[in-house]
């Protein structure tokens, strides 16, 4: 009986130790803060840990009920759904699963006259083109301006929209089109955002079209702008073929995508934005443009919550730095080719999702630097596990800088050639450092080595394999390395 008791005690101790060793989440963000009555969504500035909302004139702020969304496994105090007195700023404490905490200060103000309520009179209706510099001030109305149809800003005209303005569109053809030499400046504030909204009789995504920018003017700025229910006919709410700075903006609702950046488009800044309830939040048509995606962006409740990469070539002499935006990057069509003399740097926590039979090619004299960590590995996977991609084909012979560290390369193995059937194919003259990676599952092999005689150019440690159906390592060509002879087609359990 004593022996049984000892075994039981040891078993319970082991279970307790395993449970205590499990790493707990440290995520502790407020992702969304809104009220159902009145229907107001607050602006969250993550860098400052502030929450700001303006409620309509006459609102009783002594018992407002916030609806709060926080990070997975985190809690918030005061809790979501509980009445709170917002007469003065209120501190909300978010506690992560691991017990760490962060405070946000919520300031709720009542709009006394402007920015959506309090004024009298009729809104100004606009239809047609804008051909001279024009400013739309806040008229202090629930709706200050109504745009009927398609508005084209032409010539060298600049449309400036001031803080607190609300613009309503009359229907699905409602659109602002900024010409090649024109500009648009919408800079609101946290307390007085600029709002572009749907007509009263259509409170659905896609109720109006959006804004398209063709010009490269530095005036093109969106700050604290709310785009509500745009994106008609599956268009993006914001489409940029020119230059745009976009900060602290909200896109809520679209029958299409949130933001599309075309080949000629450039973000001068993209940070602290929230895109929600759209198809894809971001659609990017040039790989190097991904470098500008900044901090503090949130992507919530989207039908396909991924950033689309619709570009095969990272052109010569260009650099793409891929940051962790909290959602995957979806590589459509054929995949990615990092061309000669170009460079891709992938930060910790990034996840790439590839279409069926897509590939990731690292060309000669290009550079790939994958900087995963133990807690935030970089993931390369297929969109659907049953539809494999062709893996990473690594040909770069650069003498320094090529690194894949803490990556998981999985769901690989399809195509007619051996180089397309591995998670990582290492070309004959490739120079590369591989550390702490996981290769597999793969329908064929985890790693393929083209020329074993040049294996001295590869440094490796801490790599593992899982689920490689035809063996972990494939030696493609006969050769010798480190005094040992390898046969063509030989399978190894580990890297030599």
Report the location of each language-model feature:
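Beta-strand/loop edge motif enriched in small/polar residues
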Residues: 114-496
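Sec-dependent bacterial lipoprotein signal peptides
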Residues: 1-20
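Beta-rich interaction/scaffold domains
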Residues: 21-120
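Residues embedded in well-ordered secondary-structure elements
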Residues: 10, 55, 81-83, 95, ...
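Short stretches within intrinsically disordered, low-complexity N-terminal or propeptide regions
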Residues: 15-16, 76, 98, 108, ...
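Small side chains
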Residues: 13-14, 53, 294, 460
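Detector for intrinsically disordered, low-structure N-terminal pre-sequences
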Residues: 3-6, 54, 60, 161
